[in-house]
Amino acid sequence: MAKSREINMNLPSADDLFTTQEERDHKNQEYVKDISIYEITDFPNHPFKVKMDDKMLETIESVRDHGVLVPALVREKPTGGYEMISGHRRKMASELAGKETMPCIVRNLSDDQAVIVMVDSNLQREEILPSEKAFAYKMKLDAMKRQGQRRDLTSVPLAQKFKGKTSREILGEQVGESQDQIRRYIRLTELIPEILEMVDDKKISMRPAVELSYLTKEEQEILYDTMESEACTPSHAQAIKIRKFSAEGRLNEDVLLSIMLEEKPNQVE
């Protein structure tokens, strides 16, 4: 019996069938246009805070007098409108300055590409809180790992492009942090918001905070209440002890209180 031959047919996608070549080319090109600020939604789970501080007041005044000088970066949403990639502060300043539109670069980006570009553009800020780094590094690392499982737009596997380096190694090189420091920052995402805010406010330093991130949410809530009532925070040594009791299933309010009230040589490490 003659061996059947496999027929390879490259069928056009739905996008190819129902759009013109000009429309497809336009979709893959970036362009600048003025967009209503009401058509632009914030990036989902945007890790960087947009605060009303002195710098924001300066930005509002500049936008009021001169407009937005550097266009924001957005991508089109499948459901209509646009999603902000870079320019959340400029958008807020435009709103408060009474502007209806702002100039934007519209770029065609996949979900993972959008995450990476969003993080990279915001890491250029002069001041970045530990919580912002924590969630930004986690979001970018997850996106890089997903890209490593498939081919990117250049059709070259990421592992091949970076000679077998792990995503965490690549991220560390890009942001100037060691792999261990990347891991520590990402651990902070396991903290409850109240304790994470204490890290941002420099009431708890990084090393104790990492140890505390291994506690359950319920244990963290008890710890936070204890810190508030006793007006104290754990040292690194105390945090290690607290984590040990938690791992052994022996951590409760009384144990926490006894550890927190232990004399320590230095309150802040």
Regions found by a protein language model. Give the residues of each.
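Structural motif corresponding to the C-terminal cap of alpha-helices
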Residues: G67, A72, M144-G148, P193
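Residue-level marker for well-ordered alpha-helical positions
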Residues: L57, H88, T166, I192-P193
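Short, charged/polar connector segments at secondary-structure boundaries
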Residues: A2-R107, Q113-E127
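Amphipathic alpha-helical extensions and coiled-coil-like segments
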Residues: E169-I170, V175, Q179-E269
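Amphipathic, charge-rich alpha-helical segments that serve as recognition/docking helices
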Residues: M92-E190, D200, R207, Y214
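Residues that form generic nucleotide/phosphate-binding pockets
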Residues: L17, S62, M118, N122, ...
